[in-house]
């Protein structure tokens, strides 16, 4: 991701954040941590586990809904986001919750925080969708202590291959190439997105001392609703994986 991509995404999210929070804010979990476009409970998926007493960094925290919930569960939570406007929403929610969440205004490709300073780095879509993984993954590895956890959700490469730009929908046929995927630029002034083939993700993790513990291909529960996807797309996601969650461990070998 070039600095121009980071600047473009910052400008886009400063413009989109009010609409995003109005559309999705009430859907995003406020009482317990939930993952992804269908808000599957963390208590069911058990990706992060017990965060009490841990230093936790959220990549692309938006209005900090996740970080607030983790702070309420005893984490020393830090939320990082590229959008100043998102932080206006975050500060309001943090004040309402009465918890301590530190906010850092920066892109996940260049985090102004010291090495080996976190037990957990995680992201629910956010910066692992809108940041270049060739820069965000090394940053996560740099920030983690040995044995630390790196976990994030994002769209599957399969879903990216089935996305139709003209209609802005997910099709039941392959319309984009799988091999070579990396940077996706669609509409002018909209955020740039990123993804990789699965093999490239695994090579990238290994290159930076991250061992894959699990890959969860999320299947929406029957009858699930979403403010992010249509009913037709939810049915698609019950047949094929639309989003997935990687859980990696820093090995201490780097």
Task: State each model region's role.
Residues 149-182:
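Conserved class I S-adenosyl-L-methionine
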Residues 55-110:
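Class I SAM-dependent methyltransferase SAM/SAH-binding core
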Residues 109-120:
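A short acidic, Gly/Pro-enriched loop at the edge of an enzyme's catalytic core
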Residues 26-54:
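Conserved alpha-helix/loop element of class I SAM-dependent methyltransferases that forms part
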């Amino acid at each position: 991701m070039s600095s121009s991509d980071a600047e473009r995404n910052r400008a886009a999210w400063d413009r989109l954040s009010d609409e995003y929070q109005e559309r999705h804010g009430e859907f995003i979990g406020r009482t317990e941590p939930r993952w992804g476009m269908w808000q599957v409970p963390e208590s069911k998926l058990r990706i992060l586990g017990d965060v009490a007493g841990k230093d936790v960094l959220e990549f692309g925290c938006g209005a900090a809904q996740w970080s607030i919930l983790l702070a309420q569960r005893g984490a020393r939570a830090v939320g990082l986001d590229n959008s100043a406007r998102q932080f206006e929403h975050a500060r309001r929610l943090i004040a309402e919750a009465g918890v301590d969440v530190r906010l850092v205004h920066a892109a996940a490709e260049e985090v102004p925080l010291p090495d080996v300073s976190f037990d957990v780095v995680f992201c629910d879509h956010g910066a692992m969708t809108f940041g270049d993984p060739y820069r965000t993954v090394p940053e996560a590895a740099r920030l983690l202590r040995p044995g630390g956890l790196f976990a994030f959700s994002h769209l599957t490469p399969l879903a990216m291959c089935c996305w139709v730009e003209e209609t802005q929908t997910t099709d039941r046929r392959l319309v984009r190439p799988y091999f070579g995927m990396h940077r996706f630029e669609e509409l002018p002034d909209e955020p740039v997105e990123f993804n990789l083939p699965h093999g490239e993700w695994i090579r990238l993790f290994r290159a930076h001392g991250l061992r894959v513990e699990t890959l969860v291909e999320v299947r929406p529960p029957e009858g699930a609703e979403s403010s992010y996807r249509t009913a037709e797309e939810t049915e698609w996601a019950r047949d094929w994986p639309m989003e997935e969650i990687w859980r990696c461990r820093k090995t201490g070998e780097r």
